Amino acid sequence: ILRPFQGVLCADSGHINVHETGAVEATGHKVLALPSKEGKITGQQIKEYYDLHWSDESREHIVQPKMVYISHPTEVGTLYTKNELENISTVCKECGLYLFLDGARMGYGLMAPGTDVTLPDIAKCCDVFYIGGTKVGALFGEAVVITNPCLKQDFRYCIKQKGGMLAKGRLLGVQFLELFKNGLYFEISKHAIDMAMLLKDGLKEKGYEFFMDSNTNQQFIIVEDAKLQEIRQKYGVTYQERYDETHS
């Protein structure tokens, strides 16, 4: 999708910026991080960055923004509203930027209580998105959906060149055929959300505080270091990030 001198705008907390081992940079494209609020970026931020780049007379010395990356839910479990998503999409179309939505946990975003974003909304707003399989019951894989006709041509060449074309690719596709029969994909996602809310309520009763107020199954509990060490005596555990000098 991108030419060698083009980069990807995303939230500074975005998955490709913090938890992908530099994968985007490894393919030759710089991640252009924007300050996030509760894991999200806005259409206004994207427009301001775009305008700043194209008003720079020496812009050919700088990586050109060409794609916007967001995830739903975000890396911290928050959700975009329909209005926020449409606003980002509008800005991207006006500026000639591609909008990519990371849907690894999309099922949980769609089934979270209070959300007004639907799968058709995502398809309408994004140039490319993918439907997460691994985190919603599949053995492996994600389903890439390209809605922009200009990006569809030769995409299979890219898949093959990057080592993503499986000899037994039918095994990947059949999982999604089953997941989308009789609403199973959404049933699995809703069950996970329901269980996460039970866990959240129980932890709140125990006095634990949360990094974000998330309605998804991404629940980040703030834990004292001493308690974390105590847990480690019995279980394998990692933390997302340091919260302060004595908490994770």
Regions found by a protein language model. Give the residues of each.
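Conserved PLP-anchoring active-site segment centered on the Schiff-base-forming lysine
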Residues: 2-18
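Conserved C-terminal alpha-helix-loop-beta "cap" of PLP-dependent enzymes
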Residues: 4-7, 197-248
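General beta-strand structural signal in soluble alpha/beta enzymes
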Residues: 10-11, 70, 78, 99-103, ...
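Active-site-proximal loop->helix
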Residues: 19-29
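PLP-dependent aminotransferase-class I/II
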Residues: 28-73, 80-87
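Active-site C-terminal subdomain of aminotransferase-like
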Residues: 37-38, 64-65, 69-71, 79, ...
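Catalytic PLP-binding core of fold-type I/II PLP enzymes
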Residues: 80-112
